[in-house]
Each structure stands twice: as structure tokens, then as C-alpha cells.
Regions:
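His/Asp/Glu-rich, glycine-adjacent segments
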Residues: 96-237, 336
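Acidic/histidine-rich catalytic neighborhood
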Residues: 260, 264-270, 276-326
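Short, solvent-exposed turn/loop segments enriched in Gly/Ser/Thr/Pro and often Arg
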Residues: 72-95, 144-154, 227, 449-454
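N-terminal secretory signal peptides that target proteins for export/translocation
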Residues: 1-8
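Active-site neighborhoods of enzymes that stabilize oxyanions during catalysis
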Residues: 110, 126-127, 308-436, 440
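Bacterial N-terminal signal peptides
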Residues: 11-23
Length: 466
């Protein structure tokens, strides 16, 4: 025992130096360690949900309270295209998809070899994210079902990920999450992981994780993504009974996370945001751009109707599509593609409202590698597939993915916290959310397109009641 004590006394200085060295790499900015930010994204939530809930028969007391007491936007301008993964990445980077690199939900897969792979991995993001900057400054971070967080460095992580098109069950996400996280949540909420055997996983289960993490770890930054509203609006349409029920369920989960912040004692120091990534529209028919390309001889199929070769190919995202050239310098193919799609925009029955040039895509912050983009006409959507009819009945009524200048694609924003000036926010953009949160946490996002919202002023923790 004495010899052990002498050994420990000799080792103690080295241990202290090691601890100090580790701490030096993650030093929190002065005054920021006591601050917290919680961002809850309700995927596909339309601003009319909280600006006129009575018109839709919605009972959302929590969102209504936040609107009454905080600041809110009648419509946040999104990104090109208005889909989940580019939008969420623009929120946390402050830049457009052209710069952060997450240019759609699914990875462009012209020959169908990647089984519907999405942009899952944090390593694919080309610029710093809000959670990277926070972690590097010594702040505690939690990421729960936030898109593009596979492999993210965070203190608590459950990424959004699935294999193929079926139900994975809880084992996969448990294995991909921070070790011990799901065990801790299971002790607080026994059986919560059963919700991951449904499609989509229930929002309540992700909120269970958030509640446990907030109360147990008190993170400085928590990002939570709830996806059921988006799912049911796709399946049954905007404002359908199923979609309305999902909005009300999401409202209840927001209330749970707020209560957890109060219980943890961090609410007076918390900037609290409820956001969405895009709006929604309805479709009755779908157009398959790749079928049109195949009919023009620009895509060749093998005996199994798989793509054997292609000169031009589309990736679709509901309200829009990108068209890529196999050889970007192939002027002959470029001319044939323009000749195919340009006249269709003048034909209402074609289902295509607009063809966007490469320069127009760049002006909207879209993929710089795309040759051109298509925008669906009202009542139409653009969908994948190289076989079948070029125009067909829509398999489901709800879509998004249009360019961001279409008002129905506007996203949502409600914010409360110390220094927040209550009332209406005009001119908000998704790229403003990250810089707004960063300023509150005392960190800097350099060389970004967004700017902190004026409604969220200088931090003043004493401004919020307990």
C-alpha cells in the first residue's frame, strides 16, 4: 500500500500534465460553458402549422406558446434543392449545398450500383459544422438522428442511418451510437428501442434519447431531428389526418425536451429553436426524366433493364431534378439534352415548369457539377426510373424538393431564449441558423453565407424567467 502510494505520487505530475494537455485542445470560450443551445428540427413542418393552426384544426400548445413568447418566421428561405440532407447541412454550416457538398439526399448513382445510398457520412461535408466547432472549443455536443452525422465526433451520438429500403430494427442504430448511450436511455425509458422496429421510427423514441441526454449530460449543443411529419405528409399528403396527428405528436416531444432543460437547470441559459428543413406540395402525376433520356438514346439498358451505359442521366428529388452529363465537355450531348427539355417547359401537360441552366443552379447555391436542373409543374413530381411510362400517376400525394424560390418550400423557425426579441422575423434563411446559434455559444463560423438573426440579440441570461 505504501509502495503504491509512492508510485502514485511519482506519477501524479505526469498525469496532471497529460490532463492539462488534453484540456488545452478543447478550451471553452470565456462565458460560453454555461450557455446551451437546443435545436429541434421537425422535418417538413410548414410555417402555416404555427401561423394559422386553427385553420387546420391543429392542437399544438407548445409551438403556440413559443410563437406567443418568442420570435418566429412566416417562412424561412431554404436551399437548392429543398430536401432534407442539403437543408440540414446548410443549417449547421451556414453555407449552401454548392459549398458544403451535400447536394441531395441520395448519392448520384447512374448505374444503380449503390442500393439507394444516401449522404450519410460527416466526412463528406466539406466545411466545418456547428458541432465540430463547438466540440473543438470544449463544448459538450449531442446529435440525435441529425442527418449526415455518421462518424461525427460528439459526446452523445445516435446518427440517422438505414440499410436498403426495409426496417433495420434497433440493433443497427444501437451499434452506431455512442457506447452506453442506449443502455442509459433504456434504464430511464424501458423498452424505448421497440419504436425502431417500425417505419418510420417513432419520434417519441428519439425524444426519449434527447430527454435523457439533456438531463444527464447537459450538453451545450443538442441537435434533434424528428421525421414522422415528413413521412406522413409524403404518404398521405399535406394536412392529411395522419400528418396533423404527427405534427401534434412532434409538438408534445418539443414540450418534453423543454421540460428536460428546466429539470436539468439549464433552461435560463438556453437558446431554444424549433426549425424545419422545407415545406410541402401535392402531386397527382410523376414524370421520369431518365425515361425521356432513354427514349432519346442517351441511356442504354442491358437485357435485365439495368443501365449499361449513359451519356446523360438524372437524379430526382420530388419537385426537381439534376441532369448530369457523363462527359461534361460533350457539346453534342449537351445540345441534345437542351433540345429535349427546353420545349417541355412551355407545355403545361409535360409536367415540367422550368429548366434551369448551370448558371441559374449556381445562383441558387445548387450542385456545380449538374449540367442543368428541372422544376416540376404544379401537381407534378419528378421521380427516378429508366423504365415505364414517362408520365404516370403519382404513387403518393406529398412532395418537396423544388427550388427554394417557390414559396411552398419555405421552412419553419420559432426561437426563444435570453436576448430574443419577440415577434415576427422577416427574411430568415436556413443558412442563418448556424451563425445564430454559434454567436450564442460564443464561437465563430468563418467565411459563411448566413448571418446571425437580428431577433436573437446579445446573450443576456437574466432576461429569461426560470
Amino acid at each position: 500500500m505504501i509502495r503504491s502510494s509512492r508510485w502514485f505520487r511519482k506519477l501524479l505530475p505526469a498525469l496532471l500534465l497529460a490532463v492539462l494537455a488534453v484540456g488545452a485542445g478543447r478550451s471553452a470560450p470565456a462565458g460560453a460553458a454555461a450557455r446551451h443551445a437546443i435545436v429541434i428540427s421537425i422535418d417538413g413542418l410548414m410555417p402555416a402549422s404555427y401561423t394559422e393552426p386553427e385553420a387546420h384544426g391543429l392542437k399544438i400548445p407548445t409551438l403556440c406558446q413559443l410563437v406567443a413568447e418568442g420570435a418566429w418566421s412566416p417562412g424561412v428561405r431554404g436551399v437548392m434543392p429543398a430536401v432534407t440532407y442539403p437543408s440540414h447541412t446548410s443549417m449547421v454550416t451556414g453555407v449552401s449545398p454548392a459549398r458544403h457538398g451535400i447536394i441531395s439526399n441520395a448519392v448520384f448513382d447512374p448505374e444503380g450500383k449503390r442500393d439507394g445510398e444516401w449522404w450519410w457520412y460527416t466526412a463528406e461535408i466539406r466545411v466545418p459544422t456547428l458541432w465540430m466547432l463547438a466540440h473543438d472549443r470544449g463544448l459538450r455536443t449531442a446529435l440525435i438522428a441529425w442527418p449526415v452525422t455518421m462518424g461525427a465526433q460528439a459526446d452523445a451520438l445516435t446518427p440517422e442511418f438505414w440499410r436498403g429500403r426495409g426496417i433495420d430494427g434497433p440493433q443497427l442504430l444501437r451499434a452506431l451510437s455512442t457506447p452506453g448511450l442506449w443502455d442509459a436511455v433504456g434504464r430511464r425509458f424501458p423498452g424505448f428501442d421497440a419504436a425502431f422496429s417500425t417505419l418510420p421510427p417513432k419520434d417519441e423514441a428519439f425524444a426519449d434519447i434527447a430527454v435523457d441526454v439533456v438531463e444527464r449530460e447537459r450538453p451545450n449543443l443538442l441537435l434533434l431531428h424528428l421525421s414522422a411529419v415528413d413521412h406522413w405528409q409524403h404518404q398521405n399528403g399535406p394536412w392529411s389526418p395522419e400528418a396533423l396527428a404527427a405534427i401534434e405528436t412532434a409538438d408534445a416531444q418539443v414540450a418534453r425536451v423543454m421540460e428536460a432543460a428546466r429539470h436539468a437547470g439549464i433552461w435560463p441559459d438556453t437558446l431554444f429553436l424549433v426549425v424545419s428543413d422545407h415545406g410541402f406540395a401535392r402531386q397527382e402525376k410523376v414524370v421520369r426524366p431518365s425515361v425521356l433520356l432513354r427514349e432519346r438514346g442517351l441511356i442504354t439498358l442491358d437485357a435485365q433493364n439495368r443501365v449499361a451505359s449513359w451519356q446523360a442521366q438524372a437524379i430526382t428529388f420530388g419537385g426537381g431534378a439534376y441532369i448530369y452529363l457523363h462527359d461534361p465537355k460533350d457539346e453534342s450531348t449537351a445540345a441534345r439534352v437542351r433540345e429535349l427539355f427546353s420545349p417541355l417547359a412551355a407545355q403545361p401537360a409535360s409536367g415540367i415548369a422550368r429548366m434551369l441552366s448551370h448558371d441559374e443552379i449556381a445562383g441558387l447555391g445548387g450542385d456545380p457539377q449538374a449540367f442543368l436542373a428541372l422544376e416540376a409543374a404544379d401537381g407534378f413530381g419528378l421521380t427516378a426510373g429508366v423504365t415505364g411510362e414517362a408520365i404516370a400517376p403519382a404513387p403518393n400525394p406529398g412532395i418537396h424538393g423544388f427550388p427554394p424560390d417557390r414559396p411552398t418550400m419555405n421552412a419553419s423557425l420559432v426561437v426563444t431564449g435570453p436576448g430574443v426579441r419577440p415577434g415576427r422575423i422577416e427574411g430568415a434563411r436556413l443558412v442563418d441558423i448556424g451563425p445564430t446559434v454559434a454567436r450564442w455559444l460564443g464561437i465563430t463560423m468563418k467565411d459563411v453565407e448566413g448571418k446571425p438573426l437580428e431577433a436573437v440579440g446579445a446573450p443576456n441570461p437574466s432576461a429569461r424567467p426560470q
